[in-house]
Amino acid sequence: DVIIAVWPWDAYLGEEALQNGIKVGVSSWRQRSFNAIPPAVKSSASYMNSILAKKEATLHGYAEAIMLNEEGRVCEGTGENIFVVRNGILSTPPLSDGLLEGITRDTILTLATDMDIPAIEESLTRSDLYIADEAFMTGSAAELTPINSIDDRVIGKRGPITEQLQKRYFDVAYGKVPEYEDWIT
């Protein structure tokens, strides 16, 4: 037997966050090692460091945390992938830096390409976060949520590339774009 339950789910990080963004902090907790639990494995055990990082972020007044990998490169949020925009170029860490291959991450990379927004996968440092013109997180629950500050360094309101991608993402998710209707299940 199978039971399927459906209910409305508000924005994971809040409706206001989708417009105004969230404050995030870089966590002292590192993302798990490739040698401990491979990033492609989505199990409850693989979220332990994320739980600790989220708790730390909340204690410091942040909505979310950004986790670094063992080498000190930007990895991901506690349950989200991260993107930055600098000089009109969209960047996100490569999977080889130890992050989960997010469905929403892949969607945003595809949409960016289709919208002629330059998008690359490259290793990012904490400094890259601090000098970003725009930043946002993606995930099945987080959808596409702008970041307005990182470690209390102000990035500002949702930027133009973030806004374009967010609008397109929601239009696709709600079946308003015929060329992506095969994505809707």
Predicted regions and their residues:
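Helix-start/capping segments and mature chain N-termini
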Residues: 1-185
